[in-house]
Amino acid sequence: MCEYTVGYVDDDITSYNDYAKRLKRRGIELIFPDDRETKEQIFEWVQEKNIKCFIIDYKLNKVFDFSGTELALYLNSRIPDLPCLILTNYPKDAIDGNLVIQNMIENRDIMATSDPEKFEEFLSKVKQSVKVFEKRIENHKQEYKQLLDKKSGNTLSSSEEERFLDLYKLLRAYGEVDDLPAQLLESETSLKMDKLLQSVNNLIEKVEER
């Protein structure tokens, strides 16, 4: 069984099986989001498959309506810590675009390179990216537990409330926390507003009864 599960998306999948076999021998399961056409669908797939690192082709324009960098930016807007490695035949173009940091851009040939040293460096980067993501998830779990305690005691601020819900959605998607009762997922502001509206309704009913 592979220790690492890594996503892979490209608009040319002719070499995917070869890449997958090669990486599997090194403990990395490379999986492709079949039949996912939009950024939202790929985001949902990332969560379903518990992806902790994503290798993305730079252009993608033969099949998708967006580029690899646009997909990476979208995924990082939803999962800020998800490492996305960009593969391209033109690393300088990707670097000059200033949308992805340089150390997350790889020459496309790296997946098929016959240079063992370069391939080992690439594998190390992928595996280390996964470990960094897992460590950050652990840190998020600790923060989530602290906020959950405050939530249970009704002492969350509005900004903490928003952070709590964001962490819950992320950690739940990765199977790191259990489902919470619906009432715990309601914001304190909403609950207070509901109580206020109920009080107003009760007051109106009393006035109308007179």
Where are the regions that the model predicts?
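A short, hydrophobic beta-strand element within the central beta-sheet of small alpha/beta folds
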Residues: A72-D96, I105-E106
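Acidic, metal-coordinating helix/loop segments flanking the phosphotransfer/catalytic sites
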Residues: P33-C53
